[in-house]
Amino acid sequence: AFGTGLHESTGMCLKLLSRTDVNGRTVLDVGCGSGILGIAALRLGAEKCDFIDIDPLAAEAAKANLDCNGMTAEVFCGDLAETYRGHADIILANLTADILLRLKDDLPRVMKRGGVLIMSGIIDARAREIEDAFFGDGFAKADMLAENGWRAYAAVKQ
C-alpha cells in the first residue's frame, strides 16, 4: 500500500496537516493506503479518523499500521460514495489528479461546511485542471505547496 512517507506528495500532505488544527476534529483519510496520513492526524490530536480505500490490501495495511501504533479506528473498504456515510471536518486525499477529479462531487458530500480538504498526488502539469475544478466551485484555496514537480493543496469547503 502507498504511504511510506518518503514521496513528495505524502510529505507535503503531512506538512499541510501539521498547519491545520485537528484537535477534537473528525478526519477522513480517503485512499488511505498504509494509513500514514490518518495516523498522523490522530497523533496530532484528531478526535476520530476514519480510513477508506477501494483496495482490500490497502485497507488491511491501514488496519495493521493502526494496530502497530496502538490505535483503533474504522477502516472501510469500498467506493467513497457507496460506502462512507460520515461527515468529516478534515479530509486527507493523497491520490492522483484523475481520482481527485472523479471524487470532486463526492468529497463535499462527506465533509462539513468550513471543513478542510488536503489533497495531493497532483503533478504540476495537472495543477491548473485541479484548481479550475475545485476552487471557486465549493472550495476556497487556503494553502499550496510545490516540490519536485508535485503539488499539494489545502482548501476550505464554502
Functional labels for PLM-detected ranges:
Residues 90-93:
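Hydrophobic beta-strand segment of the Class I
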Residues 59-60, 100, 127:
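Short alpha-helix immediately C-terminal to the canonical SAM-binding loop
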Residues 114-127:
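ADP-ribose/adenylate-binding Rossmann-like module
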